[in-house]
């Protein structure tokens, strides 16, 4: 009977856990839809400003000094913007992006400092004893563009002052509900992409193209950081929903297995009691 009570207690515990994971799955699903909409809505703007900067950089300039964010110099120190969630329970997402950043840091032959977004990233950078330039936590599930400006300002100020010579950004790119890819890209100096052959954006710029380019570059960096954070949040909520769904399914499967064990043990207990009764009756006869 003691064994039956233990099994019954385990079934009750697993059932309670299943209720919690189911509730977390539903919450994550609600947040995921909103996060996906915000992340996907920012892609056209990000793509267009990248395209315009590429077109501007390809135009002949009038000799005006270009923005410091375009300056390429010998790399003596690198910074990496490491974007992670504040909370766990989102499958392998945190481990994957931390591994991406950790591998990158180990491969560098020059000092690397980290600007970290999210508690999980802060814990990771501290654990590997890496220099941390700044940390930003508790941005929430719906950060505004203005909320992320201090992050990009730290990076741009350090780069333009010569404190660092190159900046990379590590974040999780949202592909679909089931797929989220860890991505590492160069952020500074800004490297204008090459336009496809024959694609010529014949805009008339007022004032001069160099002035427009210099005005757009800080905005480009700020939007790149903001968009990467939105992508990471969409990925986080998607991964958490899938992880909680899997946890709920596993809990249901475990409940089924424990119920089967409980029924077998109960049947065995009843059989033994019947045998004892029959044996006692036979002894009295």
Swiss-Prot record:
Q: Which family does it belong to?
A: Belongs to the ATPase gamma chain family.
Tell me, which GO biological process terms does this entry list? proton motive force-driven plasma membrane ATP synthesis
Q: Which residues form a coiled coil?
A: none
Give the source's domain of life in one word.
Bacteria
**Role according to the record:** Produces ATP from ADP in the presence of a proton gradient across the membrane. The gamma chain is believed to be important in regulating ATPase activity and the flow of protons through the CF(0) complex.
Assembly notes: F-type ATPases have 2 components, CF(1) - the catalytic core - and CF(0) - the membrane proton channel. CF(1) has five subunits: alpha(3), beta(3), gamma(1), delta(1), epsilon(1). CF(0) has three main subunits: a, b and c.
| Subcellular location per the Swiss-Prot or TrEMBL entry | Cell membrane
Q: Which GO terms describe its cellular component?
A: plasma membrane; proton-transporting ATP synthase complex
InterPro entries in the record, alphabetically?
Answer: ATP_synth_F1_ATPase_gsu (IPR035968), ATP_synth_F1_gsu (IPR000131), ATP_synth_F1_gsu_CS (IPR023632)
Report the membrane topology from the UniProt record. Peripheral membrane protein
Q: Where is the signal peptide?
A: none
Tell me the keywords, alphabetical order: ATP synthesis, Cell membrane, CF(1), Hydrogen ion transport, Ion transport, Membrane, Transport
Among the GO molecular function terms of this UniProt record, one is: proton-transporting ATP synthase activity, rotational mechanism
Major localization listed first in the record, in broad terms: membrane
PROSITE patterns (UniProt xref): ATPASE_GAMMA
> What gene codes for this chain?
atpG
Write down what this protein is called.
Answer: ATP synthase gamma chain
Species this chain originates from: Dehalococcoides mccartyi (strain CBDB1)
